[in-house]
Structures are given as structure tokens and as C-alpha cells.
């Protein structure tokens, strides 16, 4: 499954030079997204077709993860596509997404998709090789190759955002930890390097990246859904200490 942004940027580029009326941020995002999504998916269609691969477009919103019914319907759609040899290309539907319920960025979306689809691995492509043990511009700074469960990275994470994204390395790390805790391997690598995906698959030991070691033991589908639904709570549940122990215990089944 491929998660890709770029619709807004494509739409802005496509309409550059046109005399547009004064638009607020929401109107502009909706316009550029509607125009750009066509251009973006056509580009992917052409690139994959040249290699004999079929692709399909899936537009989603954060609200689609809120209810179990929509969550499973979305999952089923992508499962059918994969079973039929079609690669889902997923993007947020910026034309109708409510600002207050937008994904932080596509790193968050990719984490939710990886969890929903019970993927073996999530590869997050950035513009650097991974998480460094210092400033990437400082001589001698190296990429942290592996992040074990519980390792503190707070001293190494910078909060700067990319010029085109809504998040940054902090968001990537937060999502990576969450997904790794669910038993899924997470890799942060440099998407600007040629053949990076092939190298990660065929030469994992030699390819520079940051790999988050997954927790042992699986997590149920329901627990994964709940783990990514913290923003959709509609009430409160009060538990006593004994109930908390039972729910955290190994015998808990949901």
C-alpha cells in the first residue's frame, strides 16, 4: 500500500498564472486538492503502468477511522484491491476534510493504514537518511540504525517541518513508536535516494536508515483500532484498580 500526498501542490502548480478570486486557506486547499488529485493519480497511473502494475486510488479522512463500520469497510476495500493485484494509493481527501479533524500529516495516515492492514512493515520516506544522533549538518553525526523498545530519542529529535508537509521528524518518531509497539517494523529512510525501496528489501544491512524494532507478540485488530482512535472519544469510562489490572493482563482478549 502506498501513501502519497502532493495533490495540493500539484493543483497549485497547475493553476499557477490563472486569475483566481481571493480565497481563504480552506477554499484554496479544496480547489488545489480537487485539481491536483487528478494530475497526481494520473502520474502514478502512467509510472506503474509502464511496469505492468495496476493501481487504484483511495481517498480517506480521519473521520473514516472513527467508527468500526467505516474502519472495516475501508480495510475491506484495500484488502480486495491487494487480492486482485491492485496497489492502493492512499491520500487524505482534502476537498472535504474538516480542518479540526485532519491528519497531522501523511506520516500519521500511513501509521493508521499500516495498523489497520496489519502490515509487516511501514517504510516512511523522508529527505534525510533517518534519525541522527545530532544535527545532520554537524560533521561526525551518524544515523541511529536501530531504536529498541523504550529507547529515549528526545535529545535527537528536531521539531522543524519540511516545506511541503504539516509534520516533521517529531511526528514521524511518534508514529513510528506507536506502530512498532503494535508489533510492526518501522523504517525511516531517505526517499530522495535512487532505488531506496529495493535496497531496503534486498540489502537491509547495508542500507542506511533508522529501524524501529517491533514489540514481540501481536496486538488484536480491535486494540489497534482503539489505539488510533483517541481523538474520537464520546464519553468517559471509570474503572477501579482491579478492572485496570484485568484489562492490562495477558488474559485480556479485546
What does each model-found stretch correspond to?
Residues 1-54, 58-254:
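C-terminal catalytic "cap/lid" subdomain
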Amino acid at each position: 500500500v502506498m501513501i502519497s500526498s502532493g495533490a495540493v501542490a500539484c493543483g497549485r502548480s497547475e493553476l499557477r498564472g490563472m486569475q483566481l478570486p481571493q480565497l481563504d486557506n480552506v477554499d484554496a486547499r479544496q480547489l488545489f486538492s480537487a485539481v491536483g488529485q487528478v494530475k497526481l493519480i494520473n502520474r502514478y497511473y502512467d509510472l506503474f503502468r509502464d511496469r505492468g502494475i495496476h493501481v487504484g486510488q483511495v481517498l480517506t479522512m480521519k473521520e473514516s477511522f472513527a467508527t468500526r463500520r467505516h474502519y472495516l469497510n475501508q480495510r475491506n476495500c484495500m484488502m480486495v484491491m491487494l487480492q486482485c493485484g491492485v496497489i492502493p494509493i492512499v491520500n487524505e481527501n482534502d476537498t472535504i476534510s474538516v480542518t479540526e479533524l485532519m491528519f497531522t500529516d501523511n506520516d500519521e495516515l500511513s501509521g493508521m493504514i499500516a495498523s489497520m492492514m496489519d502490515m509487516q512493515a511501514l517504510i516512511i520516506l523522508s529527505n534525510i537518511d533517518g534519525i541522527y544522533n545530532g544535527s545532520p549538518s554537524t560533521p561526525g553525526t551518524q544515523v541511529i540504525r536501530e531504536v529498541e523498545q523504550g529507547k529515549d530519542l528526545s535529545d535527537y529529535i528536531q521539531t522543524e517541518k519540511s516545506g511541503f508537509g504539516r509534520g516533521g521528524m517529531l511526528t514521524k518518531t511518534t508514529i513510528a513508536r506507536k506502530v512498532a509497539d503494535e508489533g510492526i517494523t518501522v523504517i525511516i529512510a531517505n526517499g530522495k535516494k535512487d532505488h531506496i525501496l529495493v535496497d531496503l528489501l534486498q540489502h537491509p544491512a547495508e542500507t542506511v536508515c533508522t529501524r524501529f524494532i517491533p514489540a514481540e507478540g501481536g496486538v488484536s485488530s480491535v486494540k489497534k483500532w482503539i489505539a488510533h482512535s483517541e481523538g474520537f472519544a464520546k464519553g468517559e469510562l471509570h474503572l477501579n484498580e482491579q478492572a485496570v489490572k484485568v484489562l492490562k493482563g495477558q488474559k485480556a482478549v479485546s
